[in-house]
Amino acid sequence: PFQPFNRSPQIRYRYTSGKGLQLTGAVLWQLQYLSAGPNGKSEEYIKNSCIPEVYVSADYKVDGLIAGVGMEVLSLKPRQQTTVDDRVYKVNERVTSLSFEAYAKYMTQDWVIAGKTLLASNLTQACMLGGYAVTSVDPRTGEQEYTPYRHSMTWLNIVYGKKWKPGIFVGYAKNLGTSDELVSDQLYGTGTNLDKLITAGAELTYNVPHWKFGVEYTLSSAWYGKLDKS
């Protein structure tokens, strides 16, 4: 869970300056890859929100080097009604999150060096760790307020060679918790009880036109923790 992965219907605009600068903006809707919430992973949360996911980025390309930064905004409505003491209440709940990334890739005839670091917030729709939790509950209506989980993810991949290509991969993910104090044990997301994760791998591939053969070994270690509301 170090690299966001998602396929979604979207409208995308890209501007290229001709001097290596590239600007990208996109609005996305959820279809196959979905956010987590009270009813598991579902498209209903973004449908209730009526606001698409937004992504913007800026890339710079020169002499085999690509470097860039990006930002993502996601706003969901987990629920539209609650039931308290056999009474049904209409509620207006929303959780909004911001995620940021910085990345670079350097390529020569023999080397490929790539890396990325993310400050990720509620990116469960992108196959990442994350989610959100409850910060307050209205005792009369059951309406809840939420705060997103924040995670730091960083990875580095280095590959050398032309026909025979040895390579290494290292990744580190850390649960940074939430910005607000929690009032409930109820969590919505993926891997919210994971404190940190470390992955290291090595590979060797043999490359010829139209074919690639290889072996890879990966070791992953995960540390888990208990919920601390304060």
Model-derived features with residue positions:
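Short loop/turn motifs that connect adjacent beta-strands in outer-membrane beta-barrel proteins
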Residues: 13-24, 60-67, 107-110, 163-165, ...
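Transmembrane beta-barrel outer-membrane domains
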Residues: 2-6, 47-53, 91-97, 145-151, ...
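Detector for outer-membrane/organellar transmembrane beta-barrel domains
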Residues: 61-194
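Short active-site-adjacent structural elements
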Residues: 33-35, 176-179, 221-226
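Transmembrane beta-strand segments that form the barrel wall of outer-membrane beta-barrel proteins
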Residues: 23-29, 69-75, 168-173, 214-221
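Residues on the lipid-exposed face of transmembrane beta-strands in outer-membrane beta-barrel proteins
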Residues: 11-15, 56-60, 102-106, 115, ...
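Surface-exposed coil loops of outer-membrane beta-barrel proteins
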Residues: 1-59, 129-144
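C-terminal amphipathic "assembly/sorting" segment characterized by alternating charged
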Residues: 195-230
